Amino acid sequence: MNKDNNISIYRARKLIKNVLTQVIDNPKNPDFLNFFHADTYRFYFLMSFMWEYLEGNEISQEYAISLVPKKYASRIKRLQVLKQAVRLNYISETSSKVDKRRRIYKPTENLLNDFFTYTDNIYINSKAV
């Protein structure tokens, strides 16, 4: 291995350790992470959903289930995850003011607070990576 490979290996090991300790094996992680880390689709959905919310976009049911490519989950699975997140009080569901049949989704205050704690911890602990 040459010098560049040693640097790459060092960075790769730091990244892997950071992901394992901060994302997967961290006992301080909020409860919502257990739900959203259960499979690839849920984690992808969480990140996409939070991105859209933080960008200020209104998130309808159809928009929410379209955030993640279809190859990760069927339409039924996508709807089930959204509805389960609502039942678990991670995401709130309200009727649109314009069209009462249309449902609008937002993260709950608890999810927002826990998500920001989670991202702050990862950011602080990964600055050295």
Residue ranges and their predicted role:
Residues 55-68:
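Short acidic, hydrophobic short linear motifs in intrinsically disordered regions
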Residues 71-87:
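Short amphipathic alpha-helical interaction segments
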